[in-house]
Amino acid sequence: MRVILLGAPGAGKGTQARFITEKFGIPQISTGDMLRAAVKAGSPLGQQVKGVMDSGGLVSDDIIIALIKERITEADCAKGFLFDGFPRTIPQAEALKDAGVTIDHVVEIAVDDEEIVSRIAGRRVHPASGRVYHTEHNPPKVAGKDDVTGEELIQREDDKEETVRHRLSVYHSQTKPLVDFYQKLSAAEGTPKYHSIAGVGSVEQITAKVLSALS
């Protein structure tokens, strides 16, 4: 079971990734974790990565693909893997295909932009305890105050509407074209199978749809 999970920030990918990896006994592979592990291991590739990162550069697709090919030969990938946050661009998707890395399923968690903005921009946090509220879906008893201490709740910078909209526009320009790429590939070659799952409803309902698509 080799899976690529796509979806905008705030679409609920992290939650679904956890269910998929537990259900199928496969690791979740994120490029960030992989790059950090390579640097820590000090392998020749890792040293290359460290050089690029230390100089503030972006790690090239060639290096990332080489790391992925290395990573998926490890024992925990015997039953497959789930790519999280990769590929992000068409050149990365093409490089993955050219490298002979086969993918069984591409799952897109599709959620309307306005729904994502409402989900994220409505979050309020109590900094001291980490308690999270939502102005609509899980409001505090007194608006703007923590239920336990009565202290002020804050909105994190990352959760502000303009930040969320900026991240969504980056997603649409960079990653959304991957949806078309994999839809066309699926239609032409029959693999990977492409599934668009509506990421609305309860977590359980979305998980049921995702697992049914993968089974």
From Swiss-Prot:
Main localization (coarse): cytoplasm
CDD domains from the UniProt entry: ADK (cd01428)
Positions that bind AMP: T31, R36, G57, L58, V59, G85, F86, P87, R88, Q92, R156, R167
Amino acids binding ATP: G10, A11, G12, K13, G14, T15, R123, V132, Y133, G201
Cellular component terms (Gene Ontology): cytoplasm; cytosol
Region (LID): 122-159
Record's subcellular location: Cytoplasm
GO molecular function, one term: nucleoside diphosphate kinase activity
E.C. designation(s): 2.7.4.3
Key words, A-Z: ATP-binding, Cytoplasm, Kinase, Nucleotide biosynthesis, Nucleotide-binding, Transferase
Domain of life: Bacteria
Gene Ontology BP annotations: AMP salvage; nucleoside diphosphate metabolic process; nucleoside monophosphate metabolic process
Catalytic activity, reaction form: AMP + ATP = 2 ADP
Pathway info: Purine metabolism; AMP biosynthesis via salvage pathway; AMP from ADP: step 1/1
Span list, region NMP: 30-59
Subunit field text: Monomer.
Domain commentary: Consists of three domains, a large central CORE domain and two small peripheral domains, NMPbind and LID, which undergo movements during catalysis. The LID domain closes over the site of phosphoryl transfer upon ATP binding. Assembling and dissambling the active center during each catalytic cycle provides an effective means to prevent ATP hydrolysis.
Function, in words: Catalyzes the reversible transfer of the terminal phosphate group between ATP and AMP. Plays an important role in cellular energy homeostasis and in adenine nucleotide metabolism.
Family: Belongs to the adenylate kinase family.
Protein name stated in the entry: Adenylate kinase
Gene (UniProt): adk
